[in-house]
């Protein structure tokens, strides 16, 4: 959201501004606000203008034609619009204008109105200090400066005016109060501010209605503003209140057809069979507004079929369905290995393909519907324990074939290697279980409204009240290096990445365990490979004793692998599958090690690469954080803190993703995409935008030199503990090392300062 100057001081300009939300293509004009038209049916739902609004605009245009502008007033209003504080002070102090008589002769629009609608906090501050009336009405809708600022989502102006006597309960001629206008702005930060600073204190009701009976939730649903809908529902907004035409929030949400809005409303218990005064339910509205697909998507996501009836669940508990998903790969892999071991490969491929389709269909139709539905993310196999089940099934088959086939043949010749593999397998099983159930470092959710208000106040004081620094889901301040996780429904401190192989996030408290896990996994695969070669050699000797000659195996020749393919294809296939896994595991170890040396997380590396591509495209930047900090505000903000947080900021285009191909999904799941990015970084290959990636990552704010970075990662902050304990144990609290000092990652709002000599130690 930008502070765009309104340079024409004519009241007719404001009529358009007052009647349209700047940040939404769908303003309140799109819903009838004037007298009801009984002849209007839902089949002709279009932009229905209020008779009163038409009259306001027509009359205003006529009046403006007859008004002779006062050059002095025009200069003053223009200065207020542009934030020219020097000119405003000169005119007020020079007695050229009186601060409470600075409105035009037609609609009495004051300098405070113009400064408010243009986010000119310095001018607003000065005018109020000179006695300007913060509750003066002006414009075609007789709105206050508070209304003008709220309509455009200017949080800092609204905050200042409220602290200096502005009345949040006042309404304009449309009957809109501060909460209605805040919702119309579609700035989630302003909505949160009003909810906690006004509604929570009892000054306004979250379900307050305008003259047409429309609540803030209804407006948000119509605008397709899923963020505001979610916050209002969390604040207790009533989903059953209907307007004067019998429309509930779900009805208007169906008109707009925003799937996320519909999901939130349906999950909160909205009745999709309820009819309007015209006798139409959501299904009829969806047909007429061509939003059937969105409604059906929301219904299926929420556990209903296309007709609105509950989908049959084969499992009473969500955990049982997840357990079936988790164990399915073990059975599937066993069948696949058996097929290729005993039947013709071509026939096995056909059967395996059909089996894959059947398994996918069965999981999607019979198992996934039993999952619990929370939030807006669709439940898919990619967001299920399926991949963690693939790993567990693979590990279990490796253990089975080693214990029952490989070990009996090789223990005599390789006793220590077998014991080593046993230890590694036990450790991998143990750490895997720990990682699946571990807390990655979730920052506690804030539920005390007083604490939330204080957090908002603190962020406003430093000009950082936006979605980058305040979590709109948990209502807590976001620490540096953190990220909100929809899986854990919490902000995860020092968030690294979501790992489908452990069905959990990797963060502050389990990152070190994850590194042990993948390292042991790679060691285990290599040890298993060595024992399998010994096993195949023993098989070859056994068959040679029986005078059975071994033929060539194409590219394998007369190697031990050929013996395995000939004499125990099942074990050979399990080994081949394990070796395939070792490729992406090795690349993951390489990527993670590189990022540890660089002192950054996987999430920070991704953001850095995306930011580079976005900046290299056309140099245009976009505000995705709902930040409305006025120009020149808060000069006391520390530059280091602001710069340190830039690598975590959302980047242009980060929400616009290209369609994923099957190959791309596989690369992402296995982490090979990260491997390619790191290789380019290591050897200094330029990216598609022509930037040298090394020059970008060399400026990472959390890079304190590779030695310091490695120590920060591998050592806990408990300096009194033995060294072995500091290395082997993961952080159990929110405290860890950063640049050699103990920091609380739950409250990390400023990074430790780099020493001058650390610059030469970078990697």
From Swiss-Prot:
Q: Where is the composition biased (Polar residues)?
A: 1-11, 34-44
Q: Which residues cross the membrane?
A: 321-340, 346-363, 384-404, 416-436, 513-533, 570-590
- Residues on the membrane's Lumenal side span 341-345, 405-415, 534-569
Where in or outside the cell it occurs: the entry states: Early endosome membrane; Golgi apparatus membrane
PROSITE patterns, per database record: ANK_REP_REGION, ANK_REPEAT, DHHC
**Spans within the Cytoplasmic topological domain:** 1-320, 364-383, 437-512, 591-763
As for membrane topology, the entry says: Multi-pass membrane protein
- Active site, UniProt feature: 499 (s-palmitoyl cysteine intermediate)
> What are the Basic and acidic residues biased-composition ranges?
15-26
Please verify whether the record's keywords include Iron. no
Q: Which domain of life is it from?
A: Eukaryota
Q: Give the CC-aspect GO terms.
A: early endosome membrane; Golgi membrane
Renumbered residue ranges of the record's region Disordered: 1-70
Q: Which UniProt keywords apply?
A: Acyltransferase, ANK repeat, Endosome, Golgi apparatus, Lipoprotein, Membrane, Palmitate, Repeat, Transferase, Transmembrane, Transmembrane helix
What note about domains is in the entry? The DHHC domain is required for palmitoyltransferase activity.
Protein family (similarity comment)? Belongs to the DHHC palmitoyltransferase family. AKR/ZDHHC17 subfamily.
Q: What is this protein called?
A: Palmitoyltransferase AKR1
> Which source organism?
Saccharomyces uvarum (strain ATCC 76518 / CBS 7001 / CLIB 283 / NBRC 10550 / MCYC 623 / NCYC 2669 / NRRL Y-11845)
Q: Which gene encodes it?
A: AKR1
């Amino acid at each position: 959201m930008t502070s765009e100057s309104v340079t024409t001081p004519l009241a007719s300009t404001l009529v358009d501004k007052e009647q349209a939300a700047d940040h939404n293509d769908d303003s309140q004009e799109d819903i009838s606000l004037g007298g009801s038209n009984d002849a209007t049916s839902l089949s002709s739902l279009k932009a229905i203008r209020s008779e009163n609004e038409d009259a306001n605009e027509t009359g205003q245009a006529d009046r403006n034609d007859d008004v002779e502008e006062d050059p002095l007033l025009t200069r003053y209003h223009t200065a207020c619009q542009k934030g020219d504080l020097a000119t405003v002070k000169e005119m007020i102090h020079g007695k050229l204008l009186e601060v409470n008589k600075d409105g035009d002769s037609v609609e009495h629009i004051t300098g405070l109105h113009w400064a408010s609608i243009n986010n000119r906090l310095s001018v607003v501050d000065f005018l109020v200090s000179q006695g300007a009336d913060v509750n003066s009405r002006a414009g075609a809708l007789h709105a206050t400066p508070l209304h003008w600022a709220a309509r455009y989502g200017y949080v800092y102006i609204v905050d200042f005016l409220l602290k200096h006597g502005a009345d949040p309960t006042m309404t304009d001629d449309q009957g809109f109060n501060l909460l209605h206008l805040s919702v119309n702005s579609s700035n989630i930060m302003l909505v949160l501010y009003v909810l906690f600073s006004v509604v929570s204190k009892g000054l306004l009701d979250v379900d307050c209605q305008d003259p047409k009976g429309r609540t803030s939730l209804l407006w948000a649903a119509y605008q397709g503003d899923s963020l505001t809908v979610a916050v209002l529902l969390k604040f207790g907004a009533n989903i059953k209140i209907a307007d004067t035409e019998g429309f509930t929030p779900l009805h208007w949400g169906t008109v707009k057809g925003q799937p996320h809005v519909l999901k939130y409303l349906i999950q909160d218990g909205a009745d999709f069979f309820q009819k309007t005064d015209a006798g139409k339910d959501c299904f009829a509205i969806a047909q007429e507004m061509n939003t059937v697909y969105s409604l059906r998507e929301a219904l299926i996501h929420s556990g209903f079929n296309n007709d609105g009836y509950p989908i049959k669940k084969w499992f009473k508990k969500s955990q049982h369905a997840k357990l079936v998903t988790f164990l399915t790969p073990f059975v599937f892999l066993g069948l696949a290995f058996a097929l290729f071991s005993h039947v013709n490969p071509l026939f096995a491929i056909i059967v395996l393909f059909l089996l894959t389709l059947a398994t996918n269909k069965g999981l999607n139709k019979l198992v996934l519907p039993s999952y619990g539905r929370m939030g807006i993310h669709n439940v898919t196999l990619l967001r299920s324990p399926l991949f963690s089940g693939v790993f567990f099934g693979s590990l279990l088959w490796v253990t089975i074939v080693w214990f029952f086939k490989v070990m009996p043949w090789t223990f005599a010749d390789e006793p220590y290697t077998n014991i080593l593999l046993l230890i590694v397998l036990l450790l991998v099983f143990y750490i895997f279980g720990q990682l699946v159930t571990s807390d990655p470092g979730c920052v506690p959710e804030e539920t005390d409204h007083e604490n939330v208000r204080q957090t908002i106040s603190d962020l406003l004081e430093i000009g950082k009240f936006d979605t980058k620094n305040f979590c709109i889901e948990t209502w807590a301040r976001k620490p540096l290096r953190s990220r909100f996780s929809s899986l854990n429904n919490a902000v995860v401190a020092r968030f690294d990445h979501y790992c489908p192989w452990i069905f959990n996030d990797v963060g502050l408290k389990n990152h070190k365990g994850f590194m042990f896990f993948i390292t042991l996994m790679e060691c285990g695969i290599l040890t298993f490979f060595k024992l399998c070669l010994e096993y195949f050699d023993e098989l070859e000797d056994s068959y040679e004793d029986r005078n059975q000659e071994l033929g060539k195996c194409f590219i394998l020749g007369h190697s031990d692998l050929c013996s395995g393919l000939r004499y125990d294809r099942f074990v050979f296939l399990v080994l081949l599958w394990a070796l395939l896994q070792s490729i992406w595991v090795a690349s993951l170890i390489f990527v993670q090690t590189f990022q540890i040396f660089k002192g950054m997380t996987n999430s920070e590396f991704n953001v850095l690469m995306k930011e580079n591509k976005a900046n290299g495209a056309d140099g245009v930047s976009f505000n995705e954080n709902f930040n409305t900090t006025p120009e020149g505000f808060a000069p006391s903000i520390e530059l280091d803190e602001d710069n340190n947080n830039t690598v975590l900021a959302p980047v242009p285009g980060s929400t616009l993703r290209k369609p994923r191909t099957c190959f791309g999904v596989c690369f992402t799941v296995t982490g090979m995409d990260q491997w390619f990015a790191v290789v380019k970084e290591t050897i200094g290959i330029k990216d598609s935008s022509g930037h040298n990636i090394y020059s970008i990552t060399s400026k990472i704010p959390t890079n304190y030199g590779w030695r310091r970075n490695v120590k920060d990662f591998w050592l806990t902050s408990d300096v009194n503990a033995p060294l072995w304990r500091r290395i082997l144990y993961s952080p159990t609290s929110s405290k860890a090392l950063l640049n050699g000092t103990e920091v609380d990652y739950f409250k990390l709002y400023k990074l430790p300062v780099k020493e001058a000599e650390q610059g030469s130690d970078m990697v």
